[in-house]
Every structure is written in C-alpha cells, then in structure tokens.
C-alpha cells in the first residue's frame, strides 16, 4: 500500500511578498507610456455588450458589506458608497456628481423569495397602486417596487455610473434631486451635485440614503463639453439599472412613494 504524500507547506510570507510586489506594479492611473484612448484588442466588444458600473450605498444587508459573504469587499461597511463592478470603495465622504440622465420611474414586481416576477410593470398597473386593508384600514404598499434611475459622472475623472433609488430613498433622495434638476433653466448635465450618506432609523430598522444638495452650475467649459458628450452617449443607451429586492438595501415600509 502506498501512503498519501504529505501536503507541501505553503510559505505565507512569499504570498504576501508577491501581493506587495503586485500592488507596486499596477495602478488605477494610466501611466504616460500608455496612450489614452487606445482600445487595441477590445474593438470587438460593442458598447451594448458591456455595462457601466453602479454607484451603490452599502446597507447592513448588502452582500458586499457582509464579512464571510463570497462577494465581500474588504473595508466596506454600511453607509459607504462603492462601485459594484470595480469594487472601489468611495467611503463615507460626500460625493460630487454631474447628472447626465434621469429616467422616468419604473416598477418591478418581486416574489416572496425576492425573485423577479415582472421586471417591467406598466405605469398605472394595479400593482403600482396603494390599497387599503378592509379590516384594519391601513394602507398597503404596492406589490411592485418603484425605481428612479440615473446616470451620473463621479468626481474629477467624470466616471460614468448607474444609480437607482427605491423605497424611502425615493422621497429622501430621488425627488429632491429631481426638484433641484428642474430648478435651473440649463441642460441636465450643466450642474454639479453633492451626495452625502445619511443615517436613517425607524421601527423597521436602520439604513442609509443619500442627502442631495446642489453645488452649482459648471463654470469650466471643458468640463461642460465632456458632460455634454456623456449625455449624448447615454441618452439612448440601454443601461443595466438596479433590479434588487428592496430588502437587500433598506427596510421597505412604503414610505418612499
């Protein structure tokens, strides 16, 4: 009989050293020796075959913020914003964005198991309406969840991100943002806004929303032109927005509608 060979010992110090060396070899910044805009090798990937990342405000039940979850992002905690594609954590600090697209509200119907039953519930459908319990006379939230969707440009790099609001964030974030957008007699992409994570609490639990404030109208012509270019790119583009069940983000009490 042959015995099993002993498993080779792993030198953790070597793995750590390799990781340290790798961190010195890569960067999110494009070095001077690489030509910006050169898409060599990626020509076959059409715009419709790629999705832009989403700007997400982590909640207690967000998988990326839960230690032990396979998709956990190191350092991410509830109340922090992050990029769901690159896993970059933006943190708790206020974010400066330019809005280049604001869609009409849409509705999604979810099942009891949080699966999507109908991703495109028509406006005016009975599932989008509040009802009243005949016995308790209490208002019952619609069966379908309302979403407000945007495309924003984040920070000095003007990084395009998809952004969706649902639940209480509609009343606390989306509608204030829409009001600010309508206030100025300028194109939607001509203003900059500040999104600040805000802690919320009620009988259903705790969660975070973005507090929205307008910084002002863009003064730099180059920034304005870049924002206009992104507006033209995304105004008709099919963007993959959030279709997550509201329980993964915040307590859903119907107060957002």
Where are the regions a protein language model picked out?
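OB-fold ssDNA-binding interfaces and closely related basic DNA-contact patches used
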Residues: 1-157, 202-209, 214-218, 256-257
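Generic detector of well-ordered alpha-helical segments enriched in charged/polar residues
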Residues: 31, 171-178, 224-232
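Extended serine/threonine-enriched, polar tracts that run as long, contiguous segments within proteins
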Residues: 145-209
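Accessory, usually C-terminal, subdomains that scaffold auxiliary metal cofactors
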Residues: 183-187, 191-192, 196-257
